[in-house]
Amino acid sequence: MPKFSTDWFTHNQKDFDMCLNQAKPIERYLEIGCFEGRSACHVIQKHLTSTGHIVCIDNFYGGQEHDSVDFNQVYETFLENIREVLNGSMRTYEVIGTTSHQALTMLNARDEEGFDAIYIDGSHTARDVLMDSIMSWPLLKQGGVMIWDDYLWDDVEGVYNQPKLGIDAFLDVFQDRIEIIHNGYQVGIKKR
């Protein structure tokens, strides 16, 4: 049974699942910001095909809201959790332990075959969320789903330190290429 010290996911799980169900089958899944792997484990157990592949990007340093967190322990817990839910399956995973900007540059350069679903839950600053979104867009397959977490998050003061402004900017610029499938604490879109 995977171990988690926090639960920032379960309260959004119904909306998350509804969005991912529109991307089925999910053979390839990309997650930006994975912490201890709660959402990644959920995707592996409930949404990823039996031979699916998951890519998780996280620098395991956290943001200003994580000053007191031991990220060496977070990384070890993440690996233990992912390995446990993958145990005995044909599914595969890759962890890219660097900034999302570096990792997404690398994934775009590798000429990836694309992802059926992308979950953006890394840095919470508007600029980083916008960059993650734009850099992920070419990696999302036609008909694929992109989900952002923490759209309404305001634990840190200043709109530039919150995801909403970055998500709104992306939605405005790409409005003719997307269908919004959910808009709440999480936002989900489908690529046309």
Segments and roles (model prediction):
Residues P2-R192:
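S-adenosylmethionine/decaboxylated-SAM
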